[in-house]
A protein has these predicted regions:
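Short helix-capping/linker turns of helical repeat alpha-solenoids
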Residues: 34-39, 48, 52-55, 68-70, ...
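N-terminal secretory signal peptides that target proteins for export/translocation
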Residues: 1-8
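Alpha-solenoid helical repeat scaffolds
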Residues: 60-61, 93-100, 112, 117, ...
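Terminal, low-structured helical/coil segments at or just beyond the last alpha-helical repeat
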Residues: 130-178
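Bacterial N-terminal signal peptides
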Residues: 10-22
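Hydrophobic face of amphipathic alpha-helices that form TPR/SEL1-like repeat modules
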Residues: 29-34, 49-50, 61-68, 97-104, ...
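N-terminal leader/linker segments that initiate helical-solenoid repeat arrays
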Residues: 21-46, 178
């Protein structure tokens, strides 16, 4: 009989998983409610935990709080850090905001090629603002920046093993305009 107590119980495992998932969901809901009430400090505290657990939406939201100085001291460096994490997880709004930070030299050295790269990733996911920003940046880029942007895309595609036939970056395909 003692051996039976040591066997895993599927119902207990499912209950534990549901509890774990509902805890994360509850924290996200608490963060959203706090933000909507204007309690940005509480939202930041709730988001911090989720962001550290790898939640891309929470990373973006926390980056936005640092970017705007709501509930936390305004910090370009912290905003950049959280946007970068979320962008690396594929969050299109973070990719767009990260691109803007590179375009404007906000918390990072101004770099049109990096800016173009990040807004292109966001545009590929349907972000209309990113599409406009990508087109605007393209007009400002030098041939050297175009070459660097192509290299960023190649490296990214190699690292992520993306299909190079996608519309990720028109520059990679040698098109003259986005």
């Amino acid at each position: 009989m003692k051996i039976g107590l040591l066997r895993p119980c599927p119902l207990v495992a499912l209950w534990a998983l549901a509890l774990c998932l509902s805890t994360v969901s509850c924290e996200a809901q608490r963060a959203d409610r706090a933000y909507l009430r204007g309690d940005y400090a509480k939202a930041a505290r709730e988001l911090q935990y989720l962001a550290e657990q790898g939640d891309a939406k929470a990373q973006f939201d926390l980056g936005l709080l640092y970017d705007t100085g709501r509930g936390v001291p305004q910090s370009n460096e912290e905003a950049l850090k959280w946007y970068q994490m979320a962008a690396d997880h594929g969050e299109p709004r973070a990719q767009y905001n990260l691109g803007l930070m590179y375009a404007n030299g906000q918390g990072v050295q101004q770099d049109n090629a990096q800016a173009y790269f990040w807004v292109s990733l966001s545009a590929e996911q349907g972000n209309g603002h990113a599409m406009d920003a990508r087109d605007f940046l393209y007009e400002k880029m030098t041939p050297e920046q175009v070459a660097r942007a192509k290299e960023f895309v190649r490296e990214y595609e190699k690292a992520r093993k993306l299909d190079t036939s996608c519309q990720l970056c028109p520059l990679l395909k040698g098109k003259s305009a986005p």
